[in-house]
Amino acid sequence: MVVDDKYDPHSVEREAQLFWENNQTFSVNECSEKEKFYCLAMFPYPSGKLHMGHVRNYTIADVIARYQRMLGKNVLQPMGWDAFGLPAENAAIENNTEPSEWTKKNIQTMKSQLKSLGLAIDWSREFATCEPSYFKWEQWFFTRLFEKNLVYKKASAVNWCPSCETVLANEQVIDTSCWRCDSVVEKKNIPQWFIKITKYADELLSGLEDLEHWPDQVKTMQRNWIGKSRGINITFNVKDKEFNHHQLEVYTTRPDTLMGVTYLALAPEHPLTSDLSKKNNDIAKFVKRCSRQKVSEEEFATVSKIGIDTGLKAIHPLTNDLLPIWVGNYVLIDYGSGAVMAVPGHDQRDFEFAKKYNLKIKQVVSLDKKDTSINEKAIIEKGNLINSGKYNDLTFNEAFSAIAEDLKKLNQGEVTSNYRLRDWGVSRQRYWGAPIPMFNLLSGGEIPIPYDRLPVSLDKQKFNKGERNNKTQEFNGRQVIQETDTFDTFMESSWYHARFTCSNDTSQMIDPVKANYWLPVDQYIGGIEHAILHLLYARFFHKLMRDEGLLNSDEPFKKLLCQGMVLSESYFYEKNGKKIWVSPSEVEFHRNENGKLTKITQINSDVELSSGGVTKMSKSKNNGIDPQVIIDNYGADTVRLFTMFAAPPEQTMEWSEQGVAGAFKFLKRLWKITYDQAVVNFPKEEIDKAKLNQQQLDLRRKTHETIAKVTDDYSRRNTFNTAIAAVMELLNEVTKIRPLCASSSIVRREAIINSILMLYPVVPHICIKLWEMLDNEVPISEASWPEVDESALQKSFVTIVIQVNGKVRGRIEVGIGEDDAAVKHKAIRQENVSRFIENREIKKIIFVPNKLINIVVSM
């Protein structure tokens, strides 16, 4: 074939991508005769542009998918769009458009960019989660969960802007104010929908043990999030004429500190607090003040602790001491019962609160069985009990058992398990989301919207007018109002992996036959920032679908790879006390005649810049690199090669213009090496090993050593950077042997062909052309992964270590199986060795074949 001796990435990539599209190369169906492999990268939110994080994520997935395809497996790699969410709604408002139009336009742009990367994607399965054909089945499934009593509605705290009359996400609350209008944000209880994930807490916890190919860090994060603990529910009676009917339930994992309780603290939302607020104006004002806090657990952990004394007393269940009851802003209503037994001596939050309000601090646990003054901080470690009456000297476990038994006898305590995990609140007071398919009855209660009315679609008019559909209507003779909340977007991303197995099925949510063929996903790729919410919800949803009979696997993802962040240099200047971040593409470096950097400025400006260091690429620091610019300049294969070569996938990757240029230089060299081989006129022949000289045998051995290493790097270790480095080393050896004869040409060709095959998953476009250049009979897209020829690994020579009186004095190369006498003779004559045995008597020579010789001489 006629080929150019110069590498033109753009023409090569256009041709390859057109071939894949026209031939639907990566469209797959179920095939019982082939082993399946389902490779899935977390699908993107259509923000409008790919960033380098996307490129890295999808390139890693594509390399794995292409490699598995070369192993002969039936490989599915789909792509879709996580299209609902607040950013689209806000962008639509700012741009005076409709979220669906804004999203559709972004999808078109990003799809084109993904295609330009040359990803081996089955585009026939593509969907966006904002399409009614997708969320219809999500709505249907929610109604099934409602019928199975796995869904309920209750009032829950949210961030509320009274001016905008809307709920705000935690990130939209800035210094206690609304990000949009600066009004003071309040905490408000509104009815919201929940799914009972806590029913599956034990299975979600135990299932982590079966996820052998998940990072330990992710599994630890999920264990901590589920947070199973063993403790005691303790009942404290309230001593008050008006409220003596109240009993306060408290859950504690540290019953050994019960004798150190000096007060009780209630959450501002606790029922007793609500009752007191109606009668006590000071408490009502305090609760109102607390309502301005954010509602996230992280905020509670760092909030400045404030409280108010209710004037009520609780009775200690073992000592009958009277304990003051306070309301504290640091108590979470959603953990335990919303009340805590405060032990300032042994809990840091209680300690800080007690110090602030001069409450009693009592030490009841000691690490050395001594009573020490607690002034600086609480003693949170477990030890032996002191100041605890009959429980003195007991260890934690002994005290747990003894106190639990005594409380049980008094009918004031019971051993139980508790979870940090809370039921999943799926309501969002937003327009751009999947509508929750429920009717609220005017008479009270809720009923699901029936299947024949699904999907419940979004009303564009309501968005344009900013209205919520809360008109009364009649359904089956009952007055109802359609639910106006939409689903949390984590709902859509919790089951998309299963829908990809049958995305064009209009008759059912999941086709069990197809789902059971493809699932679980064999390799899932995404950032570790999704370790808790997305990955936990996806595991939960998978089990819900299993219990509905839609699929039969227990877990959604067999193997999980969390790719590292992409880093880049950052630059800024200060203006009015604020840092103004400048894109690296707008930075100019000034050097003196010796090449030393003297200053950094913004291009076409005298403004001097400071370095912000190497940080994660982000909009906030304006240090992102537009991958499309790099593709336009160098081609997609260069971007892919740099991305995979710069670092192992789990580690952070630092962007480098020099690295990109180096990747492009290597591809040009690969093209030149292959071209030189292609123009040689020697006929293609089988290798006759008997005719090969030592240099040719060495190249064959290097070729098959490289195949063995790269196969291990791809399949077991996922260290693609070292695999690429190994191929580069092999090609260096190729250039040392010229195709001056048939035998040299044959072993060079073998090395080059195998190099192309091993690089194909990483740089597929150029490899297609190089493969054709060498006149191979089958397309590379149908070629198998290269196999190691074990016979080629056998060395004809071996290096022998020579010792004199046990000390290493030299090395020689000898033929494998060479005569012992000849080897000993060579050893004695070795230049350095001869100096140490000169004029000495050789008493004996110890010879370990193919390893070492030890010459023992007189001293």
What name fits each language-model region?
Residues 3-5, 229-233, 366-369, 373-416, ...:
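Long, charged, mostly alpha-helical binding arms that flank functional sites
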Residues 82, 438-442, 446-451, 560, ...:
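Acidic, turn-prone loop/beta-hairpin segments
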Residues 1-36, 267-270, 280, 311, ...:
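Basic, alpha-helical terminal appendages of large translation-related enzymes
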Residues 1-40, 69-78, 101-111, 213, ...:
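Conserved oxyanion/phosphate-binding beta-strand-loop segments in alpha/beta enzyme cores
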Residues 28-97, 126-141, 252-253, 317-353, ...:
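N-terminal catalytic cores of NTP/NDP-binding nucleotidyl/phosphoryl-transfer enzymes
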Residues 15, 19-23, 94-248, 255-256, ...:
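Residue patterns forming the tRNA-binding/recognition surfaces of aminoacyl-tRNA synthetases
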Residues 2-18, 138-361, 366, 475, ...:
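NTP-handling and nucleic-acid-processing catalytic cores
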Residues 217-249, 294-321, 325, 424, ...:
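Flexible, glycine/threonine-enriched loop-and-boundary segments that flank and lead into catalytic domains
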